Amino acid sequence: VVKPWLNDNIITINYIKQKNGGKHRAINKGIEAAKGDYFFIVDSDDFLPEDSLELVQQHIEGIKNDTTFAGVCGTKCYPNNQRVGGAFPYEILDTDSVSFRIVHKIKGDMAEVWKTSVLKEFPFPEFEGEKFVTEAVVWNKIAKKYKLRYFNKNIYICEYLDDGLTKNIRRHHRNSPKASQLFYSEIIKDNRFDKITRIKSAINFW
């Protein structure tokens, strides 16, 4: 798939192949090799609208010199243009990713575009024999120090497949017990989360 793009030589592509060790290891490897200022994670089954990167660049201009921001974040949608998680009630919202869920109570996956330097600061933990670490383990840590600029534009088109990570989240947690215990234990200790969320995490932890 990638070879024809390399041969076209229209843009610079640094293609890295490694044994499947889970998405989190792929992200770590990508961050290690990344030379750009921003990092956009796009799953192999998904794609970007034609104006996606243009919209991202427009919003980056407003935060790129502000060290309190970890990046920008647009909305995800299905191929029919319906937003994942329903309506997004803001045009622009500057907040951290935990407050985004807990305070503003917004649902649905979002499309984060991170400053590469921030992801280098917060690499994903890796556990031998485990292939899954929920992204929230890292995103929640970043939220203690940085915020994101959320904007109400679809920049990412996705289809949730029956064998995808989101569809099988419980099974992935069972198959990666150390990573899952880390995730739940950190929520239990984190006062930013409401009591119900922390109780549910305690139940899942045990």
Where are these regions (language model features)?
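Glycine-rich, basic loop-to-helix element that forms the pyrophosphate-binding segment
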Residues: 18-34
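Acidic donor-binding segment of Leloir-type glycosyltransferases
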Residues: 1-16, 61
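The conserved acidic donor/metal-binding loop of glycosyltransferases
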Residues: 43-47
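Conserved donor NDP-sugar-binding/catalytic core segment of glycosyltransferases
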Residues: 51-86
